[in-house]
Amino acid sequence: ILDNHIPVTNACEMAGYAHKKVKKQSINNYIFYDDTIRNDALEEKQMEREMEYALENGQFHVYLQPKYNLNANKIVGAEALVRWVHPEKGIIPPIKFISLFEKNGFIIRLDMYVWEQVCSLIRKWIDLGEEPVPISVNVSRLHLHNPHFKEIVLSLINKYGIPKSFLELELTESLFIKNIKLFTKIIADLRMDGIVLNMDDFGSAYSSLNMLKNINIDTLKIDCGFFNEEGITDREKIVLKHTIAMAKDLDMDVVAEGVETKEQAEFLVSLDCVVIQGYYYCKPIPSADFEKLLYQK
């Protein structure tokens, strides 16, 4: 403690905040306290106090980011994302609350809410005589430890009477790394019942060829976040080229996400990766705006 005028109780409180912060980190084993640590902790407590009320009162909104086929020049799907639209703070991005909800378990209820909203939206399109597109939803690792997970998903699909192919499940690459044997079995069971599975964020963590060899999925979503901001380097081109070719040889569809520039899009097309998701085509937008974009004449 550098300031002798800080009361002992305050100093202990500061040390407590720093201790909680450092426990969340996997690399550093010490940290210096500053006020941002305390502010972040207080913000998390506030979100925990408000999350139940927010869900019950419709503050969580489903946003959709289109998946666009560059060759066909049309939207072929979307990913459902969630935004917390707070009456006082405005839009709270998911990076602020998803990890907290993973930690306290609230993510299970929030995921279920998003899935239900998506199924309802697809049912609406069908009832209106419009041609729906598949919507993918994110799945927390916590769901995969529920022995009834498959039954929950199938029950939701049956409740709204939609084809299974229109609700796709997105599992992040990091899930498979932690328990590949368990998740390989779960995925095999899900696919046997006709549920479409995507591996999200491939290339953003510790991508494993062994993982791809053992896990049978429908779509590989390649994270293009590793692109150099100044342009695509030769090494990046080589990695991307062979990753896409490998996925296709394994009979997987490929979606490139995080595509932000025309150069990136054109290079992906040259590799026969024609479905993209990213700000180059469209940012995540409210579901009502997505409908207008999808069905504009």
Q: Locations of the language-model features?
A:
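EAL-family c-di-GMP phosphodiesterase catalytic domain
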Residues: 70-71, 87-88, 140-147, 166-181, ...
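Active-site core of bacterial EAL-family cyclic-dinucleotide phosphodiesterase domains
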Residues: 32, 36, 43-100, 138, ...
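Catalytic core of bacterial c-di-GMP phosphodiesterases, primarily the EAL and HD-GYP domains
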Residues: 1-2, 30, 40, 70-79, ...
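Nucleotide second-messenger and two-component phosphorelay signaling modules
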Residues: 25, 57, 69, 87, ...
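Structural preference for long, well-ordered alpha-helical segments in enzyme cores
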Residues: 11-19, 80, 96, 100-101, ...
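Alpha-helical scaffold elements within enzyme catalytic domains, especially in hydrolases
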Residues: 21, 53, 124, 159, ...
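C-di-GMP signaling machinery
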Residues: 2-10, 16-63, 71, 101-105, ...
